[in-house]
Amino acid sequence: MGGSPKNKRIRTKQKGKASGVSRAGRRARAAVAAQPRPKMARISDEMKYLCAMLGEEVRTWPGVTSKAMFGMLGYYRSGAVFAALPVTRAIGSANGIIFKMKAMSEAQTDRASRDLRLGTGTNIKADRWHSFEIHSEDDLRDALWWLGQAYESAR
């Protein structure tokens, strides 16, 4: 009563194979997986210090938690990631932080177009992620502003 032999034959036939995926599709997926990952840049001691200062401020915001990820510290609001600050490594530039925004308002888009430190890094493969270059303490105010915008966007 455990099932007919026909059902067993079907289960055996499907075992180990992804249903509906062609051999070419499996080869293409394997080729993508075999590609080397882009190297993450090591950050300087100054950048470690600047990011630690930013991180201290961000952790004081309501509902913010942090979690280590890929040599960076990810910041979350109510379970949604909104930023990542380098601890030992950075994505793209060694001086860059990254943040995620759902959609920029017209005012944010205008401000972003005038700020050469802001961009969508070529090493960031996901939509809505932006990078911000920090070269000195003078850049922290603007970096904090963008992190605040990302925090609000993560509602």
Predicted ranges, named:
Residues 68-127:
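Short, conserved beta-strand/beta-arch hydrophobic-aromatic motifs that form part
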Residues 39-40, 65, 83, 99, ...:
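Terminal, positively biased "leader/anchor" segments
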Residues 41-81:
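N-terminal first-folded block
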Residues 1-42:
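Polybasic, lysine-enriched low-complexity intrinsically disordered terminal tails
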Residues 37, 41-45, 134-137:
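Charge-dense, low-complexity intrinsically disordered segments
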Residues 56, 111-118, 145-153:
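Short, intrinsically disordered, mixed-charge
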